[in-house]
């Protein structure tokens, strides 16, 4: 009898452990998938941003959201004597809610707000380390992008929404969307992509977006 009881006990314990392990895996995968995607849901628009009506519908099904604009552009250095450098970069323009899921890692460890905010007459910009080497720059140097001059505040180590970044032809740079207004970078004819990352309630019905 005792042998049967002990076997039954360990059998139930094993089944319980497997169930707990399975749920832990599911939970971990869900969190990782959300971080890779950039949110619970990612919506992509080509060559435009969402209209006011579209944004209203998006807000109805989300608890929070962030807008990210991506495009390629040329950057150049300011006067370095007789040397003048240019490079193709992948620009990522973000708002104050970015990142919605996961964490962005930069060096030095500043907040995104501090790294990108306007100081004096220049907004900040975050760049990949490879761009500094390519253009012979350092943190604190200035970088010309469009009609605007940005100050390099930090280097980029990693970003969470890698699943929505697509193929990059050059080093990544991150800047504040507000700084784009007078840069001339999003003029008519510019090829850009807008991503809306959303956080939603569990089992959220998405039929409203489809229509």
Annotate each predicted stretch with a short phrase.
Residues 1-211:
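Membrane transport/envelope proteins' first extracytoplasmic loop
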């Amino acid at each position: 009898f005792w042998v049967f009881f002990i076997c039954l006990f360990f059998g139930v314990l094993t089944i319980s452990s497997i169930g707990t392990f399975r749920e832990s895996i599911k939970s971990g995968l869900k969190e990782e998938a959300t971080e890779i995607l950039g949110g619970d849901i990612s919506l992509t628009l080509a060559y435009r941003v969402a209209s006011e009506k579209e944004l209203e519908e998006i807000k109805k099904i989300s608890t929070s959201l962030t807008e990210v604009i991506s495009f390629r552009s040329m950057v150049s250095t300011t006067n370095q004597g007789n040397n003048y450098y240019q490079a193709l970069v992948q620009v990522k323009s973000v708002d104050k809610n970015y990142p919605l899921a996961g964490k962005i890692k930069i060096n030095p460890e500043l907040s995104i707000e501090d790294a990108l905010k306007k100081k004096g007459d220049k907004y900040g910009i975050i760049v990949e380390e490879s761009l500094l080497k390519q253009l012979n720059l350092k943190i604190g140097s200035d970088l010309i992008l469009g009609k605007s001059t940005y100050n390099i505040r930090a280097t980029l180590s990693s970003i969470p929404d890698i699943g929505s970044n697509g193929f990059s032809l050059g080093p990544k740079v991150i800047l504040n969307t507000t700084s784009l207004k007078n840069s001339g970078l999003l003029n008519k004819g510019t090829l850009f992509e807008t991503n809306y990352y959303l956080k939603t309630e569990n089992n959220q019905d998405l039929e409203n977006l489809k229509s």
